Amino acid sequence: MTGLERQLTEMLEAPVGALGYELVGLEFIRAGEHSTLRVFIDHENGIFVEDCAEASRQISAVMDVEDPITVAYNLEVSSPGLERPLFKAAHYQQFVGHEVSLVLKMPMNNRRKWKGDILDINGEIVTVTVDGNNEEFALSNISKANLVPKF
């Protein structure tokens, strides 16, 4: 998570929470004129289009006042979806036993991409069973983590 993403998360958790939603996480993708702020929300009863619209209005209002992003961007608000992104240690704990796809910031054993089942989370270290071996990953070295849907 970048410094900006951390700042945005801290800024938006309370307003999104006040609407009754969990701020699962967010991503800011810089792409010149086409930058995107992608915000993932969840609720115990699921997320519907109306929920995303309500959260989008609230987030837009906060962003207009605070103005933390200096470039033009598009705001996207959605549920985490089937390939749910994992941002926090609590997310890994919630999905112990599920398959996860990881992309690392710095390679480990000459690999940046890993896929396996979440075995455990201990502090800031997640253990994933990959091809029968237990591999430990520091959360600070994970640039992207998503659940792998089972069909």
UniProtKB/Swiss-Prot annotation:
Protein name in UniProt: Ribosome maturation factor RimP
One Pfam short name: DUF150_C
Subcellular location: Cytoplasm
Function: Required for maturation of 30S ribosomal subunits.
Native species: Aliivibrio salmonicida (strain LFI1238)
HAMAP family listed in its UniProt record: RimP
One GO term of the biological process aspect: translation
Disulfide bonds: none
Main location: cytoplasm
Family: Belongs to the RimP family.
Gene3D superfamilies: Ribosome maturation factor RimP, C-terminal domain, RimP-like superfamily, N-terminal
Keywords: Cytoplasm, Ribosome biogenesis
GO cellular component labels: cytosol
